From Swiss-Prot:
Its EC number is 2.1.1.-, 2.1.1.35. It catalyses: uridine(54) in tRNA + S-adenosyl-L-methionine = 5-methyluridine(54) in tRNA + S-adenosyl-L-homocysteine + H(+); uridine(341) in tmRNA + S-adenosyl-L-methionine = 5-methyluridine(341) in tmRNA + S-adenosyl-L-homocysteine + H(+). It comes from Escherichia coli O1:K1 / APEC. Dual-specificity methyltransferase that catalyzes the formation of 5-methyluridine at position 54 (m5U54) in all tRNAs, and that of position 341 (m5U341) in tmRNA (transfer-mRNA). Belongs to the class I-like SAM-binding methyltransferase superfamily. RNA M5U methyltransferase family. TrmA subfamily. It is an enzyme of class 2 (transferase). This is tRNA/tmRNA (uracil-C(5))-methyltransferase. One of its GO terms (biological process) is tRNA methylation. It comes from the Bacteria. Keywords: Methyltransferase, S-adenosyl-L-methionine, Transferase, tRNA processing. The active site is at C324, E358.
């Protein structure tokens, strides 16, 4: 695979290999055949980051080869959304001959939605001034004249200039209902929107007929919490990053959801609060004891759950675990399988043509 060529003819074979590999890894814990969710074979990534290489009068996007560290010129990127590809061409054309916009520009980040909105961030090794803002506004207007629904942001050390706004609103059809998700620049969002829809619908399916409330640790912009709210009496979710909490609160209002409560705190602090070890001012007005959380949802980083969180989740009758690293999932299952058994197993092909696998398991108490 090269950045400008995807081996689409090999899609089925690479997916089949992942299914076999996941089944083998999960064999000590389950004999289930994974439910398999396919990605689009191209234009599946909704975000991408590129370094910018200056070559005389020319400049262009590059990425670095992971093995050799050599730079690779990238003029098109079929893994990314069609909108990102349009913007890559338009941004280079708009910046190449503009001394103020191109000087000390070292990176461009793209974030797009299925609803065809985009935020483009230009990263600089220099101070950004009013002259930069004027030129950036002219570029933004020129891009919009090409029917590109784009917002521009300039970034430098300790500086962020958002010309209009630093977010876009995604609209996803989830099990017959359109969900609105505000996505903030430089915050985590699911990279493969088509796969995100399938993950959310799978999570809805496995939690059908749930009793009681749902607890989610590290909910981000509320991606899972809000979609799953229809299956539970109430949802209690924690998140530590302020921009994500603000986006989640917006998403709750935009989707007219009245049974989700977001708390800004770390999982460890939440555990202390739940167990009555410590009191927190930010929990005033929230009666934790009134929640009957029968299900806990976790979507940890690549490192998986730490041992304290492992112990915490074992206290819940049902654990819904989305993993971006099956190796650490299996490590966690060595502990979790002592008290819980795997009821459902899914493979989500979030990153086609790479070694990476995303998977989901539903665990129920033995």
């Amino acid at each position: 695979m090269t950045p400008e060529h995807l081996p689409t003819e090999q899609y089925e074979a690479q997916l089949a290999e992942k299914v076999v590999r996941l089944q083998s890894m999960m064999a000590p814990f389950s004999d289930l055949v994974p439910e398999v969710f396919r990605s689009p074979v191209s234009h599946y990534r909704m975000r991408a980051e590129f370094r910018i290489w200056h070559d005389g009068d020319d400049l262009y996007h590059i990425i670095f080869d992971q093995q050799t560290k050599s730079r690779i010129r990238v003029d098109s990127f079929p893994a990314a959304s069609e909108l990102i590809n349009q913007l890559m061409t338009a941004m280079i054309a708009g910046v190449r001959n503009n001394p103020i916009l191109r000087h000390k520009l070292f990176q461009i980040d793209y974030l797009t939605t299925l609803s065809n909105q985009a935020v483009v961030s230009l990263l600089y090794h220099k101070k950004l001034d009013d002259e930069w803002r004027q030129q950036a506004e002219a570029l933004r207007d020129a891009l919009r004249a090409q029917n590109l629904n784009v917002h521009l942001i300039g970034r430098a050390t300790k500086t962020k200039i958002a010309l209009d706004q630093d977010y876009i609103d995604e609209r996803l059809p989830i099990a017959g209902k359109e969900m609105i998700y505000r996505q903030v620049e430089n915050s985590f969002t699911q990279p493969n929107a088509a796969m995100n829809i399938q993950m959310l619908e799978w999570a809805l399916d496995v939690t059908k007929g749930s009793k009681g409330d749902l607890l989610e640790l590290y909910c981000g912009n509320g991606n899972f919490s809000l979609a799953l709210a229809r299956n539970f009496d109430r949802v209690l979710a924690t998140e530590i990053a302020k921009p994500s909490v603000a986006a989640a609160q917006y998403n709750i209002a935009a989707n007219h959801i009245d049974n989700v409560q977001i708390i800004r705190m770390a999982a460890e602090e939440f555990t202390q609060a739940m167990n009555g070890v410590r009191e927190f001012n930010r929990l005033q007005g929230i009666d934790l004891k009134s929640y009957q959380c029968e299900t806990i949802f976790v979507d940890p980083p690549r490192s998986g759950l730490d041992s304290e969180t492992e112990k915490m989740v074992q206290a819940y009758p049902r654990i819904l675990y989305i993993s971006c690293n099956p190796e650490t999932l299996c490590k966690n299952l060595e502990t979790l399988s002592q008290t819980h058994k795997v009821e459902r197993l899914a493979l989500f092909d979030q990153f086609p043509y790479t070694h990476h696998m995303e998977c989901g398991v539903l665990l129920t108490a033995k």
